[in-house]
Amino acid sequence: MLDLNITKLVTTVVIIAACCLFYLLALDSYCDQGGTFSTGICAITTIVPW
């Protein structure tokens, strides 16, 4: 039973990490095309190494 819970936890963390990665990729592409946000969110994409 404990192994099943650990597997669910690891799967959830991997899915959340993948979603964050794809979101940052899309945001980086948007900001590179000249898009801006009033909150300065495009400044975050300068940290991303790609």
Curated annotation (Swiss-Prot):
It is found in: Cell inner membrane. Its main location: membrane. The keyword Isomerase does not apply. GO terms for biological process: negative regulation of phosphorelay signal transduction system. Residues 1-4 are cytoplasmic. The keyword Cell division does not apply. InterPro entries: MgrB. Residues 28-50 are periplasmic. PhoP-regulated transcription is redox-sensitive, being activated when the periplasm becomes more reducing. MgrB acts between DsbA/DsbB and PhoP/PhoQ in this pathway. Represses PhoP/PhoQ signaling, possibly by binding to the periplasmic domain of PhoQ, altering its activity and that of downstream effector PhoP. Probably interacts with the periplasmic domain of PhoQ. HAMAP family: MgrB (MF_01596). This is PhoP/PhoQ regulator MgrB.
